[in-house]
Structures are given as C-alpha cells and as structure tokens.
From Swiss-Prot:
Name of the protein this chain belongs to: Enolase
Name of encoding gene: eno
Subcellular localization(s) per the UniProt record: Cytoplasm; Secreted; Cell surface
Subunit-structure text: Homooctamer.
Cofactor binding, per record: Binds a second Mg(2+) ion via substrate during catalysis.
BP terms from Gene Ontology: glycolytic process
Organism listed in the record: Zymomonas mobilis subsp. mobilis (strain ATCC 31821 / ZM4 / CP4)
Amino acid sequence: MTAIVSIHGRQVVDSRGNPTVEVDVTLEDGSFGRAAVPSGASTGVHEAVELRDGDKTRWGGKGVTKAVHAVNNEIANAIIGLEAEDQELIDQTMIKLDGTPNKGKFGANAILGVSLAVAKAAAEARGLPLYRYVGGTAAHVLPVPMMNIVNGGMHADNPIDFQEFMIAPVGASSINEAVRIGTEVFHTLKKELSAKGMNTNVGDEGGFAPSLDSASSALDFIVDSISKAGYKPGEDVFIALDAASSEFYNKDQNIYDLKGEGRKLTSAQLVDYYVELCGKYPIYSIEDGLAEDDFEGWKILTEKLGDKVQLVGDDLFVTNVKRLSDGIERGIANSLLVKFNQIGSLSETLAAVNMANDASYTAVMSHRSGETEDTTIADLAVATNCGQIKTGSLCRSERIAKYNQLMRIEEELGSVAKYAGRSVLRKAK
C-alpha cells in the first residue's frame, strides 16, 4: 500500500527570493508527502551539486527548472512503483541513475526533494509523525537551539568577519523555555544596539547585522544582553561561533584575511585568537574555525581546544561519510554539522550522523541561509536525538517555523520528552 504512484516537482521561492525545488509524492493508499529544499550562501567546495539553470535572463541564472524536469521525468520514471518505506532503495536508485560522484546530473536539490517527500509520505502511511517514523521509539531528545542573533560574513553586509554569533540556552528545562530565553535575549540585544545608534536590520538568518569592527565587539554586546535579559552568561546561556573561515582564507598565501579587523593571520595565529576568545567569553562551540582543507590548522585547533570546546565541521565534512571518516582518522574536529542538502539524500544524511555518533563526535542539525517554511530539520533533530539544532534567529517566519515545530513535538511527547540542555557542553566546561 506504500507504493509510489505519483511524483510532482515544482519551482518555488526560498527566503532569499531565489528559486528552489519542492516535491510532492503520493502513495497508493493516498498518503502524501511534500518537501522543499534549502540552499546555502557560504557553500563548501566539496558539497553535492545544487543544479541551477544558468539562464541569466530568468531569475538571474538561479532558476531550477532543470532540476524540476529531472524530478518529473527521469527520477519519477525510475521510482514510481517502488515502496516508499524502502528509503535506502529509493535513494540509491536516484543516485545510481544520476551516475555522478556529486549528483551533478540531476542536482542534489532534485534528489533530496524526492528523498524527503518520500519519507514524509511513508510516515503518513504509517500514521506516524516524521520524527517517530525516522527515529523509532527512541526519538525523544529535544535539541538545544543555537540561535543566530548576530550575523556577519556572507550572511550580512557589514565588516564582521565571522559569519554567525549564536546563543545556546543550555540552562533551560525544555525547548519551550529555551525559545523564551532566546527571544528575551534577542529583544534585549535589539534595544542595546538601538541605544548605541547601531543598525537593527537583520541578515539572511534573522540575526542583527550591526556595523561592528570585530568579533569581540559583537561578543561584548551579546554577553551584556544575556545579563540584562536576566540570565547568567556561561551558566544559563552559552555562546557558539560559526567563523565560516573558508570564506576569508587566502589559499594562495595560506593566510586568513580578517579584513574587518585589519589582520592577516596564519592558521596557528588564528587558533591562538580562538583560544583568547574562549578564555574571555563563554564560548562552547566553534564551527569551521579553519578552512575546509586546512587539515594542519584543524589539527592545531583540535589539540588546543578540542577537550573543552565543541569544534564543528561544516565545510570540512559537508555531511559526507568519506570526508567525515577521513577527519575522524586524522583526529580533527569533534562534531559534525548536518545539512542534508550538502549530501543530497535522507539515507546518506542519517549514515553520516550514525558515523559521527559511533566515533563519539556530536552532531548538530542545521538549516541553510536560504530556507522555506519546510520544518523537516526539526523532526530530524528529534529523530536522531542529536541534541543540537541551528535554525536561525528569533525572527523571520522560515526560522520560527522550525522552533514552533519543535515545541509541538515536545508537547506531543509529553513526559517522555527530554531537553538536551547541559549535556551538550564538553566535560571541561
């Protein structure tokens, strides 16, 4: 009864006004699944291909009609009739049909849209919410949200070199309370920035994008806002950074060019800068502290901070088991950022999370800067019990949709629900 009878892809628009792929899947029993695919701004060179049309006369070349055509033709012809519950078979059928190592023929945006829509349809056929269908009876951990309240780098038009400054309400007792704490800090920060004559416009992910000249300036504002909101920095609320350092790495010169701060640093010097920041501020997590292929730099960072700070690989691992396996073997980083459009299918995403867990690496479920109202990552965060989620700030409805879904899941789980809280902190903290 879970045989796929129809697949329909279409072009819709994401939160940045760019086209993206949405897919509808219907099963023999009438069950239905719909998924919309996100898109990143700072993308790793090792990510699966996001297929764009390249026709500059339409959508600035960013149309996805080629990917949609693949969904409605080659992919549909191959998987209509297959059982939706056989996720591995469906994903592998699409991957083999594509025939490229990076999903470059159909696009990861086409394959992922179908993959997620199939899972949603199968969940409906079983009469289960998505988190329960994917995660089974063990799914019960609500993630600590890493809330992006100051944007820089590729996510904002300001001098700040680092891309994201996030707050993590680890002292909350529930996801509901964590959202409340985050919202209170967010509104306090807005008042503080406004009082200093700073811009309170928001960036792609809903964080403020003030014209600050350094990471320290942003961190000072955040720590002050946590305190003024009535919480203790380093106890109730910790801070996480996404440096997105591949974006300011000069490969030819092998230096990190922090233009906003007017500094050019070697890998070792940048690591020392992180050590300095972690000594001064309650930072528990740093994402992409070094460039995606700066393995020597990652080794230094892991040796100096790995025992007390979560070191997250985003561009480093791109949710790819081969990249992750290599990183584990090298002993670099200690956490995997999970973005399903980096790899392009649900089964491959879950395989990466399982590999991270087996190596005692943490996993952080993540959105992209170009999002939609689709809330799949909220369900997957609970399904995998990963304990942490990045889904933006406390404004912009495409971000809030995920928080609202997490609160619904928590309510549905009732007494079984467990908020990850302080368990996400490294032991040295």
